Amino acid sequence: MFKTLVTMSLAAGLVAGTFGTAFAEDKAPVKIGWAAWSDAEFVTKLAAKLIEDELGRKVDLVQTDVAPLYQGVARGDLDAMMMAWLPQTHADYFAKVKDKVTTLGTVYDGAKLGWVVPKYIPEDAISSIEDLKKDEVKEKLKGRVEGIDPGAGLTRLSEEAVKDYGLDGYKLQISSEAGMLTTVDRAIRKKDWFVATSWSPHWMFGKYELRYIDDPKGALGEAEHVDVLARKDFEKDDPEVAGFLSRMKLPIGDLEAAMFDAQETSYEKAVDKYIAAHPDEVKAWLGKEDG
């Protein structure tokens, strides 16, 4: 069913005894889906590390696009996903599967979508999406809005924003998160003007001096929450892992800092650092507050 999926077992190649708890041999691996976005990658790999190390369960991580993630959880091909942006960004995807999935909990609050510009662009030149209609601004930006992948909710909302604001002569550049970041990095090095689609939390705000521009029409939505979705019977079939995922919640500031660490080192090192720095938080997720 998932011909295009890339499945990675975190336990592959590791010798016996690496983990403090041996894998439960009588239980199938926990299959968690994720899309190639930096926030999703960190929280998913953090969860997988703890499920394997602390709960003794093998985890298979399945990377694909957003739509197949929702479909996979709804069909039961995946046990869970940890990146449901609601109520607006993923509204269309969620509406199609809401009766076939279970919401386990919210992994973080305060998520935000928007368009960003570098801080070296004067605010009196660009403070709002409305300002992009100025002829001199359009010329500086070359009529481009740097975007991400075509299946992203941010892409859909940004396409609508171009229409809502009457940005004639502008084109949303469909790419990927990596492609957008490459363009941003190159532009900043040359002090070129640009506007890019982005979201919080994201490590780019730790690396570059960026600011959101106002969205007076609310085309890109308000603050959102990012939820953990599971297949219908997951809580009954696997109450220990489901309980862990339902309790896992990160402050958005801590998450953004960890994502920046991941870019500076690696996701694996950033995950280990987060676990070491937040022992009480991790114990609460594991249901071990009292020992």
What are the roles of these predicted feature ranges?
Residues 47-56, 131, 136-171:
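Ligand-binding cleft/hinge of the Venus flytrap
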Residues 113-123, 224-237:
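A bilobed periplasmic-binding-protein/Venus flytrap-type ligand-binding module shared by bacterial periplasmic
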